[in-house]
């Protein structure tokens, strides 16, 4: 006989099949070991490289503090989740085994128990039917059992997919968004069962895999279930660690010193504490519900119930176990309802944002009742888990006294659903019968809360009101007093300037002007009539010339070129916003690459400009489109800039980058960057460095992912003390935001920020990025913001006081457009503080439209250099402006200004115009221009023969008590997009002028004997009556 199964005389060492199985097991074990080793290497490489990157930026302590908190949260959460579920599974299996042992004992006793059976005159021992443990619930037959198991499995799969999906979202942020902070994950709800596969996108494979694992784990039982439990525990650990900042903010919360009018908590309670409780509730719900479903499924599938076609019923011990888990789920439901009480402060009902009359008098009390009722259910189930359930009818056991009928077991669920139904129906009835007939009276106190909270949350309460008549009389003397304002009126919009730059200044295909930004510089100027040199503020457009590697010819896109040669952009253009060169092209203060004296210098318009604008060697290693990593100081020189038909090469000598000075470091960087050519190239030297994460938007988001960032970084050229190589710096604004400010209305957003998801914002941080070295500095500018104060407490080494910013860079800070647009949009409604006016929307404003390149668009905020009237301003300053018109009319009603210079930074000024007088709005001015027969005829002539006229941004410029309207007109060929400034239209009072330059147009209006030969001056008297009738 063979000595073992599978062995025989022909196969003394085992059959080939067994050998193959053993070899396959060996390969599987080897693959598992290899996978673990690769994952471990990836983790080590990531931590090692990230540590070096943060160390390079002097933020190493920030990195390790995050790692410690994230690691601790992940380990604690994962261990608690794993331990809890494993304990529940072990208890379940023990109860199943005990039931099986009792049944086996009953069968054994039945076999040997003598039962007297009479056969004739003798008694024979016959086996009696086995009497096992009595079930405490009715048995389930296959037609009921199978659908029940399928439904529970689907819910379990959906739960796993849900948490995997939201965890992937947390850990894969979109760095193109202004805010990458993840939203608070909502607790799992059954409706996700029907939406599991919608919106998955690229994560569909991962989530489907998680669902398959859940299904296989349930179907195959204990073998795969521990692996699934481990994966889900890791998912929960990652989910909570991805929300690490919520715990830190809760621990380091700062008071707002403002009390909400309903629950009388400080606002900090809603912004710092509630999100943490919502996060924990989401985790607890998933943990307890998964345990409940898993335990129930294990019991239902025990004793081969599916193959037998019958489940005998739950035992008393099993029902106690399920009751305990049900109590935990009910407890989380009670916590959710308790937290939802606070959600009414953020409800949007149309008339009132926040809790309204119906919420306070009906929905809120019912929500409190639901919370108490859910907790009562939890207590009841907890009591049953200790005392046990009564045995159900139909189980073969006698009915016990006081036993609840079967309907009584479902009564709490029915009552809970009935309360939910009454909450909705009662709210609808109260709204219809009580509120709507007397809405203003009922909602008055809640409208007051809404107005006050929104103005506070968006910082509208700091706006200083002022009145502008718009009826002042400008004279040549007053124009001369405001000469600096006139010299800085913007004639060049960023779009046509960029088009011109791309035609004339890109120089090579691989250079790109991705953006042009408005700023101001102090330049040296010489008066025409004297040799006196003075300084003056000049508004400019600056456009960096960055390197776009994707534009390199495809055949030249090699690994060496991508990472060693094409490493940086070079230079910028600087154009005054008001000057025009020959042929209507932009006038440049700074342009080109290379001069007769220095091949690497940028060409300036004059020596005075060269001494006013720091240029140096303007290499851009860190920018808005520098998306690839590079290695510097290699054996291959870097392309520096083109010179004629040849190229000039250079080696990087800045502070940026991490040394690749050891084989281990090369290996870890190769793993991190997934670039194995780094290991085999022979071009590296001992002082070779790697520069990665060079996109400034990705760079700052990786350091401070908890901030919201402005979408328009702008380049500044400045000389900073102690910096020899760097003259180019990026300035970026950052915000602290929250969506948890009670009664504050976030609005619907605007063209720049559709779907706004915050209802509190402060411009608290200015960020400085060195375009050459990559250094990053965060400066706090708002000491009154509790959110930034909390982050300063968490990361004191990350933030610097604004006073420490170099003075040459302070002169270039500006009030950000994103912040200003948000406040401007909120001011459309929330300038109305009178409750009756607010309710009726009697004074609702809107942002007017303008025609730009034949398309209608809202007038965007624009920067000006001007002297603000009515506030005793001593000199012109850099301001940001937005115009308003009434909701149903087109006349001008208000102008909002934000002051940008350091000494007045952040102050807002709102000029309102008299409602009883007609003051032309931008849409009316455009209508006047377009309907004037002479001007419209000229524009029609330009729109022929392969060209088109483009009406640029219309600017409304207050000068003393008067308003000046200026609109540039560009001429652009349809085939070759090279816009030129063709004419400038100026409107003042009852006259409209169109000339080749701004000075000529102004002169044509104010000088009775203008020198401009081509100026067109037209009266507006013929159209005033039409516009007046529009107001009536």
From Swiss-Prot:
Membrane-related topology note: Multi-pass membrane protein
rRNA-binding in keyword set: no
Subcellular compartments: Cell membrane
Membrane-spanning segments: 27-49, 69-87, 144-166, 197-219, 226-248, 283-300, 321-339, 364-386, 406-428
InterPro entries: UPF0182
GO CC annotations, alphabetized: plasma membrane
Keywords: Cell membrane, Membrane, Transmembrane, Transmembrane helix
Domain of life the protein comes from: Bacteria
Record family assignment: Belongs to the UPF0182 family.
Name listed for the protein in its UniProt record: UPF0182 protein sll1060
The organism of origin for this protein: Synechocystis sp. (strain ATCC 27184 / PCC 6803 / Kazusa)
């Amino acid at each position: 006989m063979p000595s073992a199964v599978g062995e025989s005389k022909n196969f003394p060492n085992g059959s080939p099949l067994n050998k193959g199985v053993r070899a396959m097991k060996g390969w599987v074990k080897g693959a598992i070991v290899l996978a673990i080793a690769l994952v471990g290497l990836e983790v080590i490489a990531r931590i090692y490289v990230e540590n070096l990157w943060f160390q390079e930026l002097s933020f190493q302590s920030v990195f390790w503090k995050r790692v410690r908190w994230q690691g601790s949260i992940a380990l604690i959460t994962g261990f608690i989740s794993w331990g809890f579920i494993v304990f529940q599974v072990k208890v379940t299996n023990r109860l199943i085994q005990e039931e099986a042992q009792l049944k086996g004992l009953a069968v054994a006793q039945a076999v040997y128990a003598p039962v007297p059976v009479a056969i004739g005159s003798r008694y024979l021992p016959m086996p009696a039917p086995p009497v096992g443990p009595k079930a405490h619930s009715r048995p389930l037959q296959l037609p009921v059992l199978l659908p029940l198991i399928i439904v529970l499995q689907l819910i379990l799969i959906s739960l796993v997919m849900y948490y995997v999906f939201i965890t992937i979202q947390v850990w894969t942020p979109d760095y193109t968004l202004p805010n990458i902070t993840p939203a608070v994950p909502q607790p799992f709800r059954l409706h996700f069962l029907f939406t599991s596969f919608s919106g998955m996108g690229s994560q569909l494979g991962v989530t489907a895999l998680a669902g398959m694992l859940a299904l296989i784990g349930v179907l195959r039982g204990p073998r795969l279930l521990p692996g699934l439990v481990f994966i889900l525990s890791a998912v929960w650990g990652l989910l909570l660690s991805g929300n690490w900042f919520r715990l830190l903010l809760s621990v380091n919360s700062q008071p707002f010193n403002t009390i909400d009018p309903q629950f009388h908590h400080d606002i900090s309670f809603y912004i710092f504490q509630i999100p943490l409780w919502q996060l924990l509730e989401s985790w607890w719900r998933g943990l307890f519900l998964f345990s409940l479903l898993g335990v129930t499924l294990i019991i239902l599938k025990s004793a081969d119930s599916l193959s037998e076609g019958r489940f005998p019923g739950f035992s008393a011990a099993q029902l106690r176990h399920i009751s305990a888990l049900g109590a935990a789920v009910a407890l989380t439901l009670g916590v959710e309802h308790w937290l939802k009480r606070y959600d009414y402060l953020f409800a949007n009902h149309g008339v009132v944002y926040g809790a309204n009359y119906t919420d306070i008098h009906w929905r809120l009390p019912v929500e409190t009742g639901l919370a108490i009722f859910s907790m009562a259910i939890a207590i009841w189930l907890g009591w049953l888990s200790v005392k046990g359930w009564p045995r159900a009818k139909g189980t073969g056991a006698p009915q016990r006294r006081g036993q609840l009928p079967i309907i009584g077991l479902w009564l709490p669920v029915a009552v809970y659903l009935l309360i939910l139904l009454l909450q909705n129906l009662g709210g609808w009835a109260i709204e219809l019968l009580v509120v709507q007939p007397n809405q203003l009276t009922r909602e008055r106190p809640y409208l007051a809360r809404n107005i006050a909270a929104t103005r506070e949350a968006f910082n509208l309460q700091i706006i200083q009101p002022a009145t502008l008549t718009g009826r002042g009389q400008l004279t040549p003397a007053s124009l001369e007093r405001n000469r600096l304002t006139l010299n800085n009126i913007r004639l060049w919009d960023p779009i046509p300037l960029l088009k011109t730059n791309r035609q004339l200044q890109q120089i090579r295909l691989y250079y790109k002007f991705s953006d042009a930004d408005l700023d101001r510089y102090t330049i040296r100027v010489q008066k025409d009539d004297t040799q006196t040199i003075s300084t003056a503020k000049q508004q400019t457009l600056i456009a960096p010339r960055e390197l776009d590697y994707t534009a390199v010819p495809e055949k030249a896109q090699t690994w060496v070129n991508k990472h060693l040669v094409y490493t940086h952009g070079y230079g910028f253009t600087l154009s005054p916003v008001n000057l025009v060169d020959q042929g209507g092209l932009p006038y440049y203060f700074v342009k080109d690459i290379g001069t007769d004296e220095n091949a690497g210098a940028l060409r300036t318009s004059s020596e005075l400009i060269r001494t006013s604008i720091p240029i140096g060697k303007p290499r851009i290693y860190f920018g808005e489109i520098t998306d690839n990593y590079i290695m510097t100081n290699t054996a291959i020189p870097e392309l520096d800039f083109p010179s004629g038909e040849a190229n000039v090469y250079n080696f990087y000598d800045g502070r940026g980058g991490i040394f690749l000075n050891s084989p281990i470091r090369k290996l870890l960087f190769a793993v991190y960057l997934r670039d194995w050519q780094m290991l085999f190239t022979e071009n590296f030297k001992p002082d070779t460095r790697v520069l990665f994460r060079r996109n400034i938007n990705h760079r700052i988001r990786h350091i401070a992912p908890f901030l919201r960032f402005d979408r328009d970084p702008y380049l500044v050229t400045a000389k900073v003390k102690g910096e020899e190589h760097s003259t180019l710096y990026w300035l970026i604004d950052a915000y602290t935001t929250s969506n948890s400010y009670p009664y504050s209305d976030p609005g619907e957003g605007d063209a720049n920020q559709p779907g706004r998801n915050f209802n509190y914002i402060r411009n608290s941080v200015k960020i400085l990025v060195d375009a050459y070295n990559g250094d990053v500095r965060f400066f706090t500018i708002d000491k009154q913001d509790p959110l930034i104060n909390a982050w300063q407490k968490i990361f004191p080494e990350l933030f610097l006081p604004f006073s420490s910013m170099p003075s040459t860079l302070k002169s270039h800070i500006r009030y950000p457009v994103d912040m200003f647009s948000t406040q401007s949009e909120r001011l459309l409604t929330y300038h109305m503080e009178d409750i009756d006016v607010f309710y009726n929307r009697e004074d609702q404003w809107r942002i007017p439209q303008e025609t730009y390149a034949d398309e209608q668009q809202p007038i965007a905020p624009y920067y000006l250099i001007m002297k603000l009237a009515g506030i005793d301003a001593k000199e012109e300053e850099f301001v940001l402006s937005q115009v308003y018109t009434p909701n149903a009319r087109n006349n001008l009603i208000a102008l909002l200004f934000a002051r940008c210079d350091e000494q007045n930074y952040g102050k807002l000024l709102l000029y309102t115009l008299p409602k009883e007088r007609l003051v032309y709005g931008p849409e009316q001015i455009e209508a006047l221009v377009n309907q004037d027969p002479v001007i419209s005829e000229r524009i029609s002539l330009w729109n022929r023969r392969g060209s088109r006229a483009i009406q640029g941004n219309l600017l409304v410029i207050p000068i003393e008590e008067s308003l000046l309207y200026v609109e540039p007109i560009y001429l652009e060929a349809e085939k070759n997009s090279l816009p030129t400034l063709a004419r400038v239209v100026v409107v003042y009072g009852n006259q409209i002028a169109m000339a080749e330059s701004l000075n000529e147009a102004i002169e044509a209006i104010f000088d009775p004997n203008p020198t401009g030969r081509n100026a067109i001056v037209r009266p507006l008297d013929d159209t005033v009556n039409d516009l007046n009738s529009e107001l009536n």
